[in-house]
């Protein structure tokens, strides 16, 4: 997925570097809010079960795109990060039977 985003951005000459990292992080936070809004709409603010909608999928995709664009911009290997966090969660489950942090 990360390479797909990189190829798309490069082929369309989408320049992300001029945007400061903090702006990119705020954009990701904004996308999270839009995803939450689609969840609320789908559940009628918690009064019914969640139904996956096209709008929810699009907002989820926006978050993935934004995260992977940030990873490319910062030369972060997203798959390696995922492997590290899965190992962290496995270790927590093995040691304390809970994935949550102790902070």
How would you label these PLM feature ranges?
Residues 1-60, 64-103:
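Flexible "arm" and connector segments at domain edges
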